[in-house]
Amino acid sequence: MAFSRTHSLLARAGSTSTYKRVWRYWYPLMTRGLGNDEIVFINWAYEEDPPMDLPLEASDEPNRAHINLYHRTATQVDLGGKQVLEVSCGHGGGASYLTRTLHPASYTGLDLNQAGIKLCKKRHRLPGLDFVRGDAENLPFDDESFDVVLNVEASHCYPHFRRFLAEVVRVLRPGGYFPYADLRPNNEIAAWEADLAATPLRQLSQRQINAEVLRGIGNNSQKSRDLVDRHLPAFLRFAGREFIGVQGTQLSRYLEGGELSYRMYCFTKD
């Protein structure tokens, strides 16, 4: 779910309504192209040194590199017995994996992409797991409804990031947690940090994970390239490779050169 050159162009144009419309159409387009039972993760990959070597079911093994990012982000806190909301759940692979392995009391995946939610409901049928369509900047839940709000590689798509953060604060219970991972170009880092610091949430941890994401992309690159080439028409393959994370793309080079910063955070609501 990484941003492409569209992100920079729209940011310079300064039109949040245009920005939101582009993402509103882009993700359903990718779901129609990539949306089948084989492609349940659309986040970039992640691997540590030494490798994480998570014990996975055979059906999860093809998605190990994507699961690593979800696992490392989510396990900054204990999800066991918690009511969890994932904002921007994509194709639901992370929601399914975390529900099956970390045993939350309930797990709700929310996404603006109606086609993606339809795919999630069809593909991931588990006790305690639900999917709803909704806007990250206007969450359809009561105040203090969740113990954990998770967000993985998505908030760069939100035209009003502070509104999203305000919604996280609103729906989190006191003592709740916000494990979070995303990326920004260097010229947006100061604003990103300022927005995060302006919330009443208390930061527990923060680290840059460029090296781990690049390692994961490298390990997973051929698989991702093959998926794009197999499922997308030729005119969308360039954008598809940037979107899903393939070694040698412009965005991976920016990540390697330090022009992008990919970070993992954890916050709590006191």
Swiss-Prot record:
EC number, UniProt record: 2.1.1.-
Entry keyword annotation includes Ribosomal protein: no
Pfam families named in the record: Methyltransf_11
Any GO CC annotation of this UniProt entry: plasma membrane
Top-rank EC class of the record's enzyme: transferase
A biological process from GO: methylation
UniProt GO MF annotations: methyltransferase activity; O-methyltransferase activity; S-adenosylmethionine-dependent methyltransferase activity
UniProt xrefs under CDD domains: AdoMet_MTases
UniProt keyword annotations, A-Z: Lipid biosynthesis, Lipid metabolism, Methyltransferase, Transferase
Coiled coil: none
Domain of life: Bacteria
Transmembrane segments: none
Entry similarity comment: Belongs to the methyltransferase superfamily. Phthiotriol/phenolphthiotriol dimycocerosates methyltransferase family.
Chain's role: Catalyzes the methylation of the lipid moiety of the intermediate compounds phthiotriol and glycosylated phenolphthiotriol dimycoserosates to form phthiocerol dimycocerosates (DIM A) and glycosylated phenolphthiocerol dimycocerosates (PGL).
Miscellaneous section: Was identified as a high-confidence drug target.
Protein name in UniProt: Phthiotriol/phenolphthiotriol dimycocerosates methyltransferase
Organism: Mycobacterium tuberculosis (strain ATCC 25618 / H37Rv)
